[in-house]
Amino acid sequence: MESLMPWDARDTMSLRTEFVLFASQDGANIRSLCRRFGISPATGYKWLQRWAQEGAAGLQDRPRIPHHSPNRSSDDITALLRMAHDRHERWGARKIKRWLEDQGHTMPAFSTVHNLMARHGLLPGASPGIPATGRFEHDAPNRLWQMDFKGHFPFGGGRCHPLTLLDDHSRFSLCLAHCTDERRETVQQQLVSVFERYGLPDRMTMDNGSPWGDTTGTWTALELWLMRLGIRVGHSRPYHPQTQGKLERFHRSLKAEVLQGKWFADSGELQRAFDHWRTVYNLERPHEALDMAVPGSRYQPSARQYSGNTTPPEYDEGVMVRKVDISGKLSVKGVSLSAGKAFRGERVGLKEMQEDGSYEVWWYSTKVGVIDLKKKSITMGKGC
């Protein structure tokens, strides 16, 4: 199998860390992961062994001096806290403590860390936040991915439209990409890269705006592309952003830790900042909803691999099959009906209903519309 994601100097450490976190989980298919990451099994097992023996330090090209020192003074601890705060100034005491421990440092109790940070002005300012609500999550990775654009903002090269994609179960960030627009073609290009790296989810949810949805309920070309890949598509309820609450929380962290008060000269600087923070978020930053584990420790790439190839729809015997023409229309018993531009060139199946002259319109395994020949009408949409 051709290598999909060869390692290079720019992101070697983050890829090694992703690999060992995924490969260390129960039931992991290590050889399949090696193919996904573009490395040989021998290399994969080498990094797994180093990870088991030395932790994060074992993934470095050069071994680092261990940080373990059981008898550190208050000044030593404070110096560590200052260093961690300089790197992650928006993190509180709980995240800082866990992060330093993950780096190999022996830390005192949480109360001591909190008091030291408060004494030296290292705690982030309190923010009003959003009232806590009941939290729901899927029971395994890749059952549901949440996708959205974070509000666009100016930078030295124009405007940035950050595309974000989050796994519901693990909170793992699958994509944080600088985009210059919000067109379907731009989203598909980014999603292909994500699918090649992490496989296909069972379902994806988005809001109702362009390019993934339509406020009128009409099917979009992006929805059809995802459904053709076997991905079920859902949408958040209008005016209910909490439906995508995990992604909204991710956006607030992105704003606070990366964007707030910053100016980026060009797209390269901007994407490097996104890539760095995504690595920190996935592999270093403790997550309170995960009992202070990092998202990368809870995520596993999907077993459903992306090939780019799709099979045409097949319909049961007795189902009337019609092809939608280039203008988005189909003909049923001499009646011309508009199925919509998204279905141009597609073969749809018509299942006769009990009421004479009425048909359900199906595309693959999804009901996409209803036809009433008596009224010479067709209704295409998600509520059919």
Swiss-Prot record:
Biological processes per GO annotation: DNA integration
Protein name per Swiss-Prot or TrEMBL: Uncharacterized protein YagA
Domain spans labelled Integrase catalytic: 137-303
Organism: Escherichia coli (strain K12)
A single MF term (Gene Ontology): nucleic acid binding
Gene designation per UniProt: yagA
Gene Ontology CC terms: cytosol
Gene3D superfamilies for the chain: Ribonuclease H-like superfamily/Ribonuclease H
Family annotation (PROSITE patterns): INTEGRASE
Induction note: Expression is repressed by the transcriptional regulator XynR.
Highest taxon of source: Bacteria
